[in-house]
């Protein structure tokens, strides 16, 4: 199979993976409207083509939180990576490290902090949820700090799990889920051999380390689902801000006023994100939400963004809309499921090449030159006319 884009990795991953795993990463909440709009809205953002600009000394390098990045991209937190490739978190982290960009370990990773951190030279980032069990949160933070994690990504848009209907149909949840998953696994031999047999243990490494016993998918659905905390407020984050020494990023911002609150709180960064369309269907796509948020807080706080980004052109679009750096999610997971570390490495090379093409043809020699001026104006403020009413309606 020829791999020329993330979409090729998606098709390959669908063939390799048992349906419960493919649809878990590929699906979204409710009718998946926001999941679709994340991709479609971003694809409609029009860039200005510029010519005869002497682009021979183009550079993608940037700096974030005093870290040098080879390009304004990081691998975002994705749960259960180790179910998609053998010790998947380690493989993805190694690919990111080799490319000179950060890797973010999820709270609900298969590989624990202590397995991933020593496998790479660059300090990794760590993502944490707000859970009722504050003892687990403190334990995870202490272990992340001891492992040398540099940046904390604090996810706040999951006070309760989203309604993901695909999961019930695919076997991730629903009636007879365990038996359905087993039958799917044995009919997908490549995955069964590489991950099912040779990728063990399949427990949730960070949670097992705290509970002192093996965990699995039932704990992911049960213990974790019962521990999300709908009572969370900004005040609950204060002890974390005091405890954590490094940069703290608030993930799950879609409204300018919440972005301003993050600045007032003292966060170092925010992630403009709707959780990849996996939480509340019908909310703004990240591409729609980003311009108003950038208007509100650009320069006061680092702005990261995710959701809907599938290639290097999308990265350039997001930066033009106001992001400083973007996080990859599904795109790298498709590649990981298809070809492990080599797949993620190839995807990052593709994204870098696509960014260079987009920057060359828009006349931006550096990341700092990708601005609102890189967008076609007159179609609506920073967005095509079809998107502008939503963006204006969300301005605060």
From Swiss-Prot:
Keywords in alphabetical order: Cell inner membrane, Cell membrane, Flavoprotein, FMN, Membrane, Oxidoreductase
Catalysed conversion reaction: (S)-lactate + A = pyruvate + AH2
Domain of life: Bacteria
Name of the top EC class for this enzyme: oxidoreductase
Entries under InterPro entries matching the protein: Aldolase_TIM (IPR013785), Alpha-hydoxy_acid_DH_FMN (IPR012133), FMN-dep_DH (IPR000262), FMN_HAD (IPR037396), FMN_hydac_DH_AS (IPR008259), LldD (IPR020920)
GO cellular component: plasma membrane
Active site: 275 (proton acceptor)
One Gene Ontology term of the molecular function aspect: FMN binding
Localization annotation: Cell inner membrane
Domain called FMN hydroxy acid dehydrogenase: residue spans: 1-380
SUPFAM superfamilies xrefs: FMN-linked oxidoreductases
Principal cellular location given in the protein's record: membrane
GO annotation, biological process: aerobic respiration; lactate metabolic process
Cofactor section: FMN
Enzyme Commission number, as recorded: 1.1.-.-
Binding residues for FMN: 106, 127, 155, 251, 306-330
Matches recorded under CDD domains: alpha_hydroxyacid_oxid_FMN
Membrane-topology descriptor: Peripheral membrane protein
Positions bound to substrate: 24, 129, 164, 278
HAMAP family: L_lact_dehydr (MF_01559)
Family: Belongs to the FMN-dependent alpha-hydroxy acid dehydrogenase family.
Function, as annotated: Catalyzes the conversion of L-lactate to pyruvate. Is coupled to the respiratory chain.
NCBIfam families on file: L_lactate_LldD, PRK11197.1
Protein name: L-lactate dehydrogenase
Organism: Escherichia coli O81 (strain ED1a)
Upper taxonomic lineage: Bacteria, Pseudomonadati, Pseudomonadota, Gammaproteobacteria, Enterobacterales
